Structures are given as C-alpha cells and as structure tokens.
C-alpha cells in the first residue's frame, strides 16, 4: 500500500482553505453583468474565453494535493448547483467561500465546529422557507425574457429568442442549442413528432426536389419486431390498397423481400408506402413505439401481447395528416389521437420523471413528453469566430436552464438582493447556544456576499452597496449594469428562486463538511529532486 501524508486540525484547515480561495477567486470575477472573462488554455486548438462559473471551476486542478482537495470540494458545489438548476454556479461558489472563510475563523477562535454547522444549517433552512414565500410566478413572456437576459450576462437578444422558443413549444417542449452557420441567432420550430430515423430506401422518395418522402393522410403500421417476409405484410397492404391511402411502416427493421416488395409496389403505383426503423433502442424503443401509437391512435403489433402481423387489421393502424421523411429524420404531423389520450400518456411519463434519479433518463423522458406535445425548438447560435461561438453557446445554455428553473419555482429580485433582504429579516434568529448563534451570523453574513461581489466586479464598494440595499424596501436593489438603485422587479433584474435556493443549500452543505474536518489524508509524493 502506498505511503500517505496526513495533516491535522489547523494545518489541514489552512491548506484546504488555500485551495478553496484559489478556485473561488478565479470563479467569482465572472459574477454579475460587469463580471470579467476568464481565458482557459486547451491542450489543442484555440483557448476558450468564458464567463461561466462551472467551466472555470472544472478547469482548475492544483499541484498541492491538500490544497487540491479543498478546491475539488468547492468545485463540487458548482457542479451540483449546475446539475440541479443549470445556473447559479458562481453564486454557489461565492457563498461557499464566504461560509468556509468565516466558519474556519470561528473554529480557530475556539468555537465548537458541530454547533457552528448546526447554526449555519438553521439559518439556511429559515432562508429557504423565506425564499419560497418570496417567489413570484414566472409565466408571461416578458418575465421569461428578463430571466434569460440576466442569466446570459444582460444579453437581451438571447432572452428574447429563449422566450419565443418557450412560447412556441410550451413549458414541456424540448429546446436544443446548436452552432449555427451565420452571424445571427436563429430559431426553428419542428411541429409534430420528429425522431432520428430516415427512409430505408431512396426509392420511397416522392419529392425529388427536396429529396424527401411526403405522405398525405397515411395509415401508420407499428411493429415491434424485424420484418423480412412479405407474407406477413400482405393482408395489411391489401387493406390499405382498397382504402386508396398511403402507408408508413415503423418497425425494428425491414429488409429482404418485404423491403423489395414495398419498393416495387411504390414504383408501380400500387400502394404508396414507406418504411423506417423504430427510434431508440431496447426498452426505450418499445416506449417510443407506444408513444407513436398514442399520437396516431394506432396499436403496436407485438407478439408479446399476442398480436400477429399477419392478422393485423386496418383498425389497428394509426393515421396522421402528413408524414415527411428525409434520409435522417421522420416527422409525423397531425396524429389522429384524442387530446385526452395524449394528456394521459404525458401524465404517465411525468410520474416516471418524478420516480427516476438518473439525469440521463429524465432528459430522455422529457424529450418524449416534448415529442408527444408536438414541440421541439432549435436555437442556432450565430458568431464571428469559433471562440465567440463556444462562449455564446455556454451563455445560452445557462439562460435556457435559468428560464426553466424560473418557470418551475418562480422568480425573486436578482443581483443578490433576495438573499441580502432575507439575511436582514433573519437578524433576530437564535440557536440553542452561543456557538450556534455564531454559525447563524456566519451564514447571514455570507448571504450578502453575492451582492458585494457583483458590486466589486462593477467597480463599486461592496459594503456601501450592501448597506444601501438593506436600508431599502422589499425589492429595492442595485443595478450593477447601470450603477443605479431602484425596484429590481420593475427594472427586470430577476433570478429564478430555484437557482438561488440550490446555490445556498449546496454551498452550506459543503461548507459544513469543511468546517467539521479535523484530518486530511493523501498519497505521499516522493521528493525526486535530489536524485541523479
């Protein structure tokens, strides 16, 4: 077993604190509308320029292993806040730094670390309750625009395009961010259900100009297996031919004589048909087929439930107003489903989202809801250079997560004002003993730190701004972009309550662990400098 280095008590805490401050000092310069940029070196290609706190945090790895342990723990704060709310990473880091610095001073002065932690937790729990009570619903387009703009570092164009996307696809809709080709941002909305599977043969193409298959008012056959024999398909093909309508077949795969016969029928004009592979893999494929069945009022022909393809009837086929198939995608518009059937299916998937802990599964389930709800928006980012493109894409991603968080839990006054006001309201909060009271004071002082840092980054004196804001009414705050004071809600400076809440909770969690740390152990690094 490798030799270990061990540090105890104050020696351990000082090393850890040095790492915390190194990382936090690099991250906090990005906070607020006048936050500075950080340039990150890459092992290949051009360096990237960012104002995204979590990107800066992830880039930092320290040489000293004890210092690095402190830095990595604060990095965890930024990552956790980013995972839950998608934004607020810099705020979380600033809060954690303030809590750890003040907390360790109190420990050095002889306070009981466990009581300090209990005091911090008590203050944070009370602050979260007040934050939830303070939150206002965010549902109108202007509020969403303002939240998006603030999160994207006061870029109104980004706020506008996100609000427009949300208006078009709804709160359950999927909004994806891609790199565009031009200089300006573009928004495109895909109506209906789209999935990433194209036609199985170019002979199905009906529109030679666009190179797409376009089927009007088609029947849709859904099969949960591979189809190779034409014998299985004949009854359905004959029924569709009699009805003089086109047919889309979605199956695990179609090949051999089945595919060849469909192509021949197409070329001769007997039955206008097209075939695509079912989207997804494994259990996800079955779920997606069921979604398409609900959307088109059809039935999945599956031997698992005793349905055979040879005995399929025309009543088991789904239908839609239009289907467009390119070489890469299939889009179903105007499925024949009743609204109530889609609502029930969406409700079922929402329950699955509540019960799953995997962020990957949640994302996939959310995409299924969006496809059923008929909303997928794509924001294409325009920029002059690749470096600018990466920086802008990071900001749009942050803004998108912030607006989702705002719609979910509401909005509060931005610019660090909400936490500063809450700290003032909790000034009389008391713990069970004097050490807990110190912990409460540490937490309340730390809650002012984001506002102070925003003011410092804007070139103002943090303490002066904090005192002025505390003296004002509920929404009175400081607009760092203009240097003016006023009503933050009216000025459109808003923060999602979820972002502020998660930043505070994760910062307090890690700070509590660090304050109560008494020993640090790491692998011993042999000194090779004297070796020849």
Curated annotation (Swiss-Prot):
Annotated GO biological process: protein refolding
Chief location category: cytoplasm
Subcellular location: Cytoplasm
Keyword Membrane: no
Claim: NADP is one of the keywords in the record: no
PROSITE patterns (alphabetical): CHAPERONINS_CPN60
Catalytic activity, EC: 5.6.1.7
Keyword entries, A-Z: ATP-binding, Chaperone, Cytoplasm, Isomerase, Nucleotide-binding
Pfam families, alphabetized: Cpn60_TCP1
One annotated Gene Ontology cellular component of this protein: cytoplasm
InterPro entries recorded: Chaperonin_Cpn60_CS, Cpn60/GroEL, Cpn60/GroEL/TCP-1, GroEL-like_apical_dom_sf, GROEL-like_equatorial_sf, TCP-1-like_intermed_sf
Record GO terms (molecular function): ATP binding; ATP-dependent protein folding chaperone; isomerase activity; unfolded protein binding
Domain of life of the native organism: Bacteria
Catalytic activity: ATP + H2O + a folded polypeptide = ADP + phosphate + an unfolded polypeptide
Principal EC category: isomerase
Sites where the protein binds ATP: 30-33, 51, 87-91, 415, 479-481, 495
Function: Together with its co-chaperonin GroES, plays an essential role in assisting protein folding. The GroEL-GroES system forms a nano-cage that allows encapsulation of the non-native substrate proteins and provides a physical environment optimized to promote and accelerate protein folding.
Family: Belongs to the chaperonin (HSP60) family.
Assembly and binders: Forms a cylinder of 14 subunits composed of two heptameric rings stacked back-to-back. Interacts with the co-chaperonin GroES.
Stated name of the protein: Chaperonin GroEL 2
Organism: Vibrio vulnificus (strain YJ016)
Lineage: Bacteria, Pseudomonadati, Pseudomonadota, Gammaproteobacteria, Vibrionales
Gene transcribed to yield this protein: groEL2
